[in-house]
């Protein structure tokens, strides 16, 4: 039969590995290989370096400063010596330091810490999004695997009866047309099995691709273990915490604005040579000390505008948080009701699958003696396939609802 080779090839490929891969393994692999998460983690490391750089700017800064020139006057032509002193030789070692208000220093460190926290919140949200994407694909593949297992069991069950029916047809115990009807059903079930295998292989390889796994061999996956029984709690979750971080950041930016308008003091000391080379330049060795003072007086209204900008940002933050809370409650309520409805049907559908399977097995025994009509067997097979498909769809639906609930409750 032209499908036999493909059938046994897919069967071998599917069971090429004995150990099923779990959902957690796929999620861990995706997190490990995600360039997006790696980029966020690199930004956190960069912020740590920025904090060290800021700390270094608070220490005394040392520099060597040299300004040297010579302005000759040739036949009365040249720069005015009163202005230029004709020449200058300057070589100074300068030490300077800016003295910031302790509150300004703390606010700057706080700003870097809040940026780091915002990145951590983003990482957690990205991890949830990534885990949900992998979970959704895993559930799709698992639903296909259920179809593979059901169609495989039914195919093997019918295949075992083929020889007995053939003998009954040759002995005229059953009609040749009934035997042909059975063979058509058997071949159709074989096609269903092969189609289920192909669909599973496609979703399985897509799952590997999304998780960053380069292995193209096909193996089974384990049943996803999801628990959507506990209602998610939004308080203290990353969805709520990101708005808390934004609020703290806005408050801290107000402090930074305030401190930027406070007086700023700097001090310096230098020593070296600073000479016009006009008279005893070796005596021009010396040192100096000084300080600088900056007091903002008027900035054209920039401070007020910067406050207004932060006010708009805070209003938008409050609106987004309120919107999230409202949508969250609506979504959780809807998902909880869907899960309850799905659970109530689950056991009934499972019982129907078991009944139809038992009926087919009973018909299989009767087929060996020709005591059952082939049409009844075909009807039972059709009922089994319908029940199995309903069970698979209900299983996938339940897993997807649990995945949605887990997304908010991790």
Please report, for each region that a protein language model flagged, where it lies by residue.
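Bacterial Sec-dependent N-terminal signal peptides
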Residues: 1-34, 405-410
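Amphipathic alpha-helical coiled-coil segments
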Residues: 39-54, 126, 130-151, 167, ...
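A glycine-/polar-enriched beta->alpha junction
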Residues: 28-38, 48-60, 92-110, 121-128, ...
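Small/polar (Gly/Ser/Thr/Ala-rich) solvent-exposed segments
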Residues: 61-86, 96-125, 260-287, 294-308, ...
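Transmembrane beta-barrel architecture of outer-membrane proteins
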Residues: 88-90, 136, 181, 264, ...
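Periplasmic alpha-helical coiled-coil/stalk elements that build and connect Gram-negative outer-membrane
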Residues: 49, 121, 127-241, 335-338, ...
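Bacterial Sec-pathway N-terminal export signals of envelope proteins
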Residues: 18-61, 173-175, 208-253, 336, ...
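Surface positions of alpha-helical coiled-coils, especially the charged/polar e/g heptad sites
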Residues: 22, 29, 36, 87, ...
